[in-house]
Structure formats: structure tokens, C-alpha cells
């Protein structure tokens, strides 16, 4: 991609414009490695992006991203904007510099050309700014004049572009631009990290499928730049990948890979782009029951609770019994026998939200991979028993953090390189439960309501541009069409607003901040109630997520 001259006139230079690849149905997971587990093949957050903003600028940037992503799905937390401790002087990029990272959204044109133009007008307003317009000389020429425009939020952040989809699904595509000489090496590098082969591969472009359902595809792609162009790493944005068997992966990487915490490692690709690797499973020795009670008692004395209790779940207590279980209460079928007493003690003690720790305004300060409580061969939340919505619910709870696991934790701030202790823990990475999905009760509803949710969301495009802070979705995390099929799922009503700057610091000694999370009622007799049910006055803690 050339900001001035375009792709040099080659026939395949428009491959990233969406004309060739936007609507083709090449993104099924049939090309993934046979070694991939079901959990890996169906993880929509396998790739995510951290954006580092200057102090006081995170909220408008986060809202701008959420508003744009709402056109694909109202609850698609693939990005998290955080703030660095202090403003830093930026180096002026070379003239005609090409940012190494881009995000391309493919929107279905069947909803009308005006809808795409309306979103394009939104990207022309602050904090968005126009970066450049790409010229395409291939055999497929875009008919919309805006379909080759690229925008950016702030210096050092990814490029953003909108493309019409002629047929097929809507797509969120992460694109990394590679040096001409490093393209082959970069392809092998990301193939190693993603543990899958590209579904479409050309001499200068390839696409890795990340997640696919009936309506949305999430993709990761590489684009080879001409010889006279060099990509510039986005110093205020970092790609994060979930990986398995980090110990086996590290020796195979081309550049040094150093741990920044127990759960995350930092490395670079061949072009100097900073990469975070999050260990999918952190096998950690379980604390003794006495230690759990002691830690819980200590936090009850140190954390003043509001007038209404806040039910929460530890990674273990959030596990639910299979759908066909005859017992009304939760059963920890995935727990080792020796740990039943421990989790019974946790359930009897006053629970604390697993995200109620102190935060700072810096980035990457929290190990996010909790211990896997289910079998590594077949995770409980993706077992063959139970409805898809139930399995997705257990998948969601399987990645919650326990505050007990953070005692003495340290992590390196990727932005500053400083070591940070557990008293300065910051942004939770992509896989802790966000506030809008933190309701502890799932509500299965008739399948026709779930099947109409997606159509209702699309019909909303007839109105003004959706604002994620005001969107009321009719689905919980587990019941979204993003995780389930149209035929059956559970659904709940949830609502959340973007966190205000004052909520970026949550201390153990301050009252817990509630988020609006309406209660829901159990409607399916086959679904056992979870360990804690939200009462009329119960509120949940605001969560930071990507």
C-alpha cells in the first residue's frame, strides 16, 4: 500500500481493499492445524490490540473505537485503550512512513451505501483523522470513493479502513505490513504463533482465520510492501496473542522472548513490531484452603463493601454443572478431588470480585492467565454436553481471575520497561469478564428471540450511528450470536458505559464501583442456578478489558 502512488499497478495490489477478499467465504477454519483444540479454534480473542494513550486521552479514544466496532457487533471487545504515566516526546516519523499495523472493517453493502458513507463521515471527525488515500490499479476497482481511505486515532496507533462486502460475512481484519525482504520470515513467524496455516496465500498477501460464525469473521493478515517502502512499528499499539505451550514456543522464536509476568511474555517480529504472548494455561499450584480463608478474611477487613453485596465468582466457583445434571446446585465436575474442600470454602466465605485490585494508569501490568480447572485435553466449557450457550458461559467464566493468585505478582510495564508490583496492577488483558457481561445468572430464552437478535441489530443501522455506551444488547456474553448458533442460546439484557477516567484506579481500600447490570431471572428448568444469584440491589464491578 502506497499512500501516494498506491500499489505500483500490479494486479494483486488491491487484495487488501476488500474487492477480492471481502466477500469470499475463505475464512472457515478448515485450514487450521489439526493440532488445534476446539478452544483455540473458536477463540475470538486469540488476537487483540492494546493501545497506549497519553494521560487523559484514553476515554475518547476508547469510545471512538467502540462506536465504530458497534457496526460489526455491539459487544466486540478486541481493543483496550490505556494511559501511560506521562506524556512522552514523539519522534517525527519519516515522510511517507507506512504504519505497520492496520484494522480493516468489511461492512455488508446490502444495508445501503448511505450506511457506509455515514460511518465514513464519522471517521472524518475528531478524534479520528484522515491519514491517506490508497490508489488501486488492480482488476477490481472500488465503486465507492471512500473505500480506499485510511484513518488513524493518534500517532503510533493502527490505521483504520472501511470496505464494502459484496457478499458473505462482515469481517474484522488485523493487518500487519511487512518489509519486502522479511515477508516470508514474517509468514513463518506468525504461523508459528497462531499454530495454523493461512487460508489464502499469495505472493504478497495472506490471511489467517481467527474466528468464524454465521455472521462475523475475525482474521489476521500479512501484507508485503514494495521494496521502496518500510513499515514503521506502532509504538503506541501492541498486538497480543494467546498461545499454548509457551515453553515450547520460546526457543523457536527468532528474537529474544522475555517474561514480563507469570502469564505473559514479550518479543518482536522480524520488522521490530512488539508482540505480547499470553499463556493460555498457567499451571499453578493451588493454595491451601487455610490460605484462601486467610486471604479472604484479610480482604474483607481491608475493603469497605457498599450497602449492597456484590456477588462474584472465582475461576473455580464460576464453573457450572452440565446442562443435563439432575442436581439443582452447581457441581465442580472439572475439579480435582483434592480441591473440592477448597472451593467449598471459597463459596462459603464472603466473595470479592476477582477484578477488585488497585490499578494504575500504565499498561500491561497484570498476569491474566488463570489456572485451568478443567481437563487440558477437553476443556469443560467446550465439552460435547450441553447447549452452545451453556458451553460459552462456562468458557467465559473459565478465564476469570482470582485476586488470591495476584499476591506478590510482578509484571514489566511494556511502555516504560519498569517493574511493577501487585500494588500497581493495571489493565486486565482481553480475557477477563467485561462489566457488561459480568452478570452471574444466564437467562435462556426461546431460540427465536436469539435468532432475531442479529437482524434487530442490523435494522438499527437505519437510525443514527450506534454508540456503544448507549447500546442495550439483548444478549449476555454467553448468548451472543458471536459465540453461539442462531438455533439456540441463552440471552440476557445488559448495559454498560465506558469507564470514566476516575474509574481507572480501583484500590482495595476504596468502595467498589457498581456498573449498571440489570438482574435476570432463570427461565429454563434444566439449567442449574449458578453459585450466586444477583439480588434486586446487586451491582457488579466495572471491568477493564480489550
Swiss-Prot record:
Residues 285-302 have a biased composition (Basic residues). InterPro entries: FAM124, FAM124_dom. Residues 304-324, 347-361 have a biased composition (Polar residues). It holds the Pfam family FAM124. It comes from the Eukaryota. Residues 24-36, 488-511 have a biased composition (Low complexity). Coiled coil: none annotated. Transmembrane segments: none annotated. Residues 1-37, 285-361, 488-546 are annotated as: Disordered. Belongs to the FAM124 family. This is Protein FAM124A.
Amino acid at each position: 500500500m502506497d499512500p501516494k502512488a498506491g500499489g505500483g499497478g500490479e494486479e494483486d495490489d488491491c487484495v487488501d481493499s476488500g474487492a477480492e477478499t471481502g466477500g469470499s467465504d475463505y475464512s472457515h477454519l478448515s485450514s487450521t492445524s489439526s493440532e488445534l483444540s476446539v478452544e483455540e479454534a473458536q477463540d475470538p480473542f486469540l488476537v487483540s490490540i492494546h493501545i497506549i494513550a497519553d494521560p487523559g486521552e484514553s476515554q475518547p479514544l476508547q469510545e471512538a473505537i467502540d462506536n465504530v466496532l458497534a457496526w460489526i457487533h455491539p459487544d466486540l471487545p478486541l481493543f483496550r485503550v490505556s494511559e501511560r504515566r506521562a506524556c512522552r516526546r514523539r519522534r517525527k516519523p519519516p515522510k511517507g512512513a507506512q504504519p505497520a499495523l492496520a484494522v480493516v472493517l468489511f461492512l455488508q453493502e446490502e444495508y445501503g451505501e448511505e450506511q457506509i458513507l455515514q460511518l465514513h463521515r464519522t471517521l472524518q471527525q475528531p478524534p479520528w483523522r484522515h491519514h491517506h488515500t490508497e490508489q488501486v490499479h488492480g482488476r477490481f476497482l472500488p465503486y465507492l470513493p471512500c473505500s480506499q481511505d485510511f484513518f488513524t486515532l493518534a500517532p503510533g496507533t493502527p490505521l483504520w479502513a472501511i470496505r464494502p462486502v459484496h457478499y458473505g460475512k462482515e469481517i474484522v481484519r488485523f493487518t500487519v505490513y511487512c518489509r519486502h525482504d522479511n515477508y516470508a520470515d514474517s509468514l513463518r513467524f506468525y504461523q508459528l504463533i497462531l499454530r495454523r496455516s493461512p487460508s489464502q496465500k499469495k505472493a504478497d498477501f495472506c490471511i489467517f482465520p481467527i474466528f468464524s460464525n454465521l455472521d462475523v469473521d475475525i482474521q489476521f493478515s500479512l501484507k508485503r510492501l514494495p521494496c521502496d517502502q518500510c513499515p514503521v512499528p506502532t509504538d503506541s499499539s501492541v498486538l497480543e496473542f494467546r498461545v499454548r505451550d509457551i515453553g515450547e514456543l520460546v526457543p523457536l522464536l527468532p528474537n529474544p522472548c522475555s517474561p514480563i509476568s507469570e502469564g505473559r511474555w514479550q518479543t518482536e517480529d522480524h520488522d521490530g513490531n512488539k508482540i505480547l504472548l499470553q499463556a493460555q494455561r498457567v499451571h499453578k499450584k493451588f493454595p491451601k484452603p487455610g490460605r484462601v480463608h486467610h486471604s479472604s478474611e484479610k480482604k474483607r477487613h481491608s475493603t469497605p463493601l457498599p450497602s449492597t453485596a456484590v456477588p462474584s465468582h472465582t475461576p473455580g466457583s464460576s464453573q457450572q454443572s452440565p446442562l443435563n445434571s439432575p442436581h439443582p446446585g452447581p457441581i465442580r465436575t472439572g475439579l480435582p478431588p483434592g480441591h473440592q474442600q477448597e472451593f467449598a470454602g471459597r463459596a462459603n466465605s464472603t466473595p470479592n470480585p476477582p477484578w477488585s485490585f488497585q490499578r494504575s494508569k500504565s499498561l500491561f501490568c497484570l498476569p491474566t492467565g488463570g489456572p485451568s480447572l478443567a481437563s487440558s485435553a477437553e476443556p469443560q466449557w467446550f465439552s460435547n454436553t450441553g447447549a452452545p450457550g451453556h458451553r460459552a458461559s462456562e468458557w467465559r467464566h473459565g478465564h476469570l481471575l482470582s485476586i488470591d493468585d495476584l499476591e506478590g505478582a510482578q509484571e514489566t510495564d511494556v511502555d516504560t520497561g519498569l517493574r511493577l508490583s501487585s500494588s500497581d496492577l493495571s489493565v486486565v488483558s482481553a480475557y477477563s469478564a467485561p462489566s457488561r457481561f459480568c452478570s452471574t445468572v444466564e437467562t435462556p430464552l426461546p431460540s427465536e428471540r436469539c435468532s432475531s437478535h442479529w437482524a434487530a441489530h442490523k435494522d438499527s443501522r437505519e437510525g443514527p450511528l450506534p454508540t456503544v455506551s448507549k447500546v442495550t444488547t439483548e444478549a449476555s456474553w454467553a448468548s451472543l450470536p458471536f459465540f453461539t448458533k442462531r438455533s439456540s442460546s441463552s440471552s440476557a439484557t445488559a448495559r454498560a458505559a465506558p469507564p470514566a477516567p476516575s474509574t481507572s484506579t480501583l484500590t482495595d481500600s476504596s468502595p467498589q464501583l457498581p456498573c449498571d447490570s440489570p438482574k435476570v431471572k432463570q427461565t429454563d428448568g434444566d439449567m442449574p442456578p449458578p453459585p450466586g444469584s444477583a439480588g434486586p440491589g446487586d451491582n457488579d464491578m466495572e471491568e477493564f478489558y480489550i
